[in-house]
Amino acid sequence: KMTPENLGFNLVWDAETRVDLVDQEMLYAMKKAGCRMMSYGIEHGEFIHEIKGGTATLEQAENAIKWTHNAKIETVGYYMIGLPKETPETIRKTIDFAKKLNCTYAMFAITMPFPGNKLYDEAVKSGLVKLDDAWDQFVYSGVGVGGIQAPVLTTNSLSASDLEYWAKQAYKEYYFRPSYIFNKFLKIRSMKDLKMYYDGFRMLKKDM
């Protein structure tokens, strides 16, 4: 068992999993074994059931984040924007759901249909992929290291510029909430913490 008693030292580690694969007992055991942060692919506030192949629900996502926080483990929630059936209304549901879950950190990515997967094949058939077979378009830059990823997939109701707008809007609404900022200030314990949060907010503001 990976506990300090058995190892003879404190091992700090992070993990990634699905919201439908955890329970309270497991998370408390992981915390005791040194787990610092859990990352979850929550993906969407409307289409989570479809994305996860019918195995995950919004309720499971809520429970997983609540249980993880109760175990004193930080969380990262990953969300997708720009699925083929996406509309401004479904994006709004994703942003609102992300704020409701209130993970320690949230990442919003524009959907990337890599050649060879089901989403790519469907997008090609429906004419939603804007691609000239240049593989450099599949290199993810992300917020903070070059801005929002330029979409290669559009939807029937959202253009590439619309998707970029909504991805930036998601970050703005999530990280610049007064309650989120206040909570981070309460966790500052050193100048190193202050610098880390300051640099993070400055980076986000620059890319918005």
Label for each model-derived stretch:
Residues 189-191, 197:
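Secretory/periplasmic and organellar redox-cofactor proteins
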Residues 2-189:
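A structural motif corresponding to the C-terminal lobe/cap of the Radical SAM core domain
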